[in-house]
């Protein structure tokens, strides 16, 4: 094998965000751009001789090309073996599962998660460590530092690897193992949940609809829901984990036909022109079905790379914050969690509903910055079992990523045992613990300067806001959230502005770290309602006062010209 050493110069914009490096496809297709970042990873992470790497992505545009480049670079940088998903496909939680099961040195995941795909869309890359989780900040900071000083990269001169055939092939001295991307993950799910009970539920007339949003979870959903759980399908039941392969343009060479229980199951490089973000705005097709006539009993969706989830009942939406709390309160009903929970962790903007469950269970609840990487240390140290973010991410210590299908199966297991509707489960939870009324307002694509101006204004107002009275609400504390990791003592500053009120209400302002164009300003609103007679109120109606305060103190409309959010969750 001939190794080519290519001279290069640094790019200045390769600082990883919350979930790796995300840019427009056009940026990644620049000469040397992807190669520079991959070499920065390999230069930062000490690679033992003959180490094994996991590689795969969500199937978006440029995925296959990137996989081939990384395979050749891995061979040139001394890896002994790469486990790559068939067709270059691996959902993010499945990649974490494979890293952990096969005890590899780590993995490279190609995804921009919920961001749009296609030639004019987004692309992303991140490195996961040997525990299966996203690289912590000390590693991503080192990768960024390496990217700013890179002078050359190493790449093998070799032909492309056949990604659509399972089995081993040789790339120089390195073995490339094309693996079934679904099998290990599906087996893990079957070890955690009572598939027999869920199968009985689905055979009882209980109807589900899962929207894969033309993203990576389609093959996983078909294998688990159709093949293993016998959910109704209009498609041949044998099509599942071992039968799909992507052609050069990323389309399935054995098309998946519309199914009763799984919709939009065919992964497409542009996600069918949609925005693979499972929320009430972008998953509108599913929402219309669940809120329509003759609606199914249960609905769910996942995102581009399979790590997020949205849960719906018949004419009913479950907020991600409530979902985390409800899973924790009902974990004893699920085989994989019957021995109890060590603790719960939530991101700071996520509602405090989980805190109330943790208190009732007598276990700790940790508040971390946004980003799944902050949960990794807590899970590795055995401090927490369940974790969640308000941004439709829920998971546990079974892997080190949030996991969309895992959350869906957890809900189905609970419903199978309790034999109640989604709405009844949620309302009984509120009756027991009280309702944390919660909403997130996203202002997407704001000019970065204007968004930064809003945040600077708020930071400069801390002194005047302290103790301020807004009608019946009085400010108790305002700060820029800082987190000290209880495991390794590392400190993360500047994680979001909190306005805390005496009665427990909160307003949080945060700039998102996952977009690629402009800035996304998120406003999180939360109040606690113990009165069951008010639990029926619409969240936006109940949060009107907090919304007005947020807009007033941030001068958001004046500074951005936006008169309403892009997305309300």
For the regions a protein language model found, what residue spans apply to each?
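N-terminal small/polar loop signature for handling phosphorylated ligands or for N-terminal nucleophile
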Residues: 39, 52-121, 223-311
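Gly/Ser/Thr-enriched, mixed-charge loops and adjacent short helices
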Residues: 2-11, 32, 119-240, 248-292
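Short glycine-rich or small-residue beta-strand-to-loop segments that form or flank ligand, phosphate
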Residues: 24, 51-58, 126-128, 207-210, ...
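Positively charged, low-complexity intrinsically disordered leader regions
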Residues: 1-38
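Glycine-rich phosphate/diphosphate-binding loops that line cofactor/substrate pockets in enzymes
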Residues: 38-53, 195-203
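Phosphate-binding and adjacent anionic-ligand microenvironments
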Residues: 296-298, 302-304, 311-314, 335-527, ...
């Amino acid at each position: 094998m001939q190794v080519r050493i290519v001279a290069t110069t640094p790019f200045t914009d390769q600082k990883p965000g919350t979930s790796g490096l995300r840019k427009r496809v056009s940026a990644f297709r620049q000469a040397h751009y992807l190669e520079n970042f991959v070499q920065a990873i390999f230069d930062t992470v000490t690679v033992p001789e003959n180490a094994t790497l996991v590689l795969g992505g969500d199937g978006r545009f440029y995925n296959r090309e990137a996989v081939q480049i990384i395979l050749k670079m891995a061979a040139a940088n001394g890896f002994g073996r790469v486990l790559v998903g068939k067709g270059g496909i691996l959902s993010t939680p499945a990649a974490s599962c494979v890293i952990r099961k096969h005890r590899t040195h780590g993995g490279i995941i190609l995804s921009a998660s919920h961001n749009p795909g296609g030639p004019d869309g987004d692309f992303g890359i991140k490195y996961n460590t040997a525990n299966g989780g996203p690289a912590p900040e000390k590693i991503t900071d080192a990768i960024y530092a390496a990217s700013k000083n890179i002078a050359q990269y190493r790449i093998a001169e070799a032909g492309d690897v056949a990604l659509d055939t399972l089995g081993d092939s040789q790339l120089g001295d390195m073995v490339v193992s094309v693996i079934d991307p679904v099998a290990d993950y599906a087996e893990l799910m079957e070890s955690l949940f009572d598939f027999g009970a869920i199968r009985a539920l689905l055979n009882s007339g209980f109807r589900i609809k899962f929207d894969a949003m033309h993203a990576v979870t389609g093959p996983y959903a078909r294998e688990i829901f159709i093949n293993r759980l016998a959910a109704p399908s209009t498609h041949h039941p044998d099509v599942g984990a071992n039968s799909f392969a992507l052609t050069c343009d990323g389309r399935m060479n054995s098309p998946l036909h519309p199914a009763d229980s799984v919709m939009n199951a065919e992964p497409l490089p542009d996600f069918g022109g949609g925005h693979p973000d499972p929320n009430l705005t972008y998953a509108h097709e599913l929402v219309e079905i669940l809120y329509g006539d003759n609606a199914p009993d249960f609905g769910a969706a996942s995102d581009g790379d399979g790590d997020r989830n949205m849960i719906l009942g018949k004419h009913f939406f479950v907020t991600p914050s409530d979902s985390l709390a409800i899973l924790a309160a009902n974990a004893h009903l699920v085989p994989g969690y019957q021995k109890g929970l060590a603790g719960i962790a939530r991101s700071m903007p996520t509602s405090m509903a989980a805190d109330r469950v943790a208190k009732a269970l007598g276990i700790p609840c940790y508040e971390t910055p946004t980003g799944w990487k902050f949960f990794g240390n807590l899970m590795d140290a055995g401090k927490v079992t369940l974790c969640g973010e308000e941004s439709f991410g829920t998971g546990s210590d079974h892997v080190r990523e949030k996991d969309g299908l895992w959350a869906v199966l957890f809900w189905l297991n609970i419903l199978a045992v309790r034999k109640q509707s989604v709405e009844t489960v949620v309302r009984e939870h509120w009756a027991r613990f009280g309702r944390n009324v919660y909403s997130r307002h996203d202002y997407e694509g704001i000019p970065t300067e204007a968004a930064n101006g809003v945040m600077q204004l708020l930071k400069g107002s801390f002194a005047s806001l302290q103790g301020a009275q807004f009608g019946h609400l009085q400010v108790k504390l305002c700060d820029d959230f800082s987190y000290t990791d209880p495991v390794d003592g590392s400190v993360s500053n500047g994680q979001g502005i909190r306005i805390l009120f005496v009665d427990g209400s909160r307003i949080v302002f945060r700039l998102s770290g996952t977009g690629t164009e402009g800035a996304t300003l998120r406003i999180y609103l939360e109040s606690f309602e113990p009165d069951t007679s008010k639990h029926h109120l619409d969240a936006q109606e109940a949060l009107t006062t907090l919304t007005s305060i947020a807009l007033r103190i941030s001068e958001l409309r004046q500074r951005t010209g936006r008169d309403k959010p892009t997305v309300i969750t």
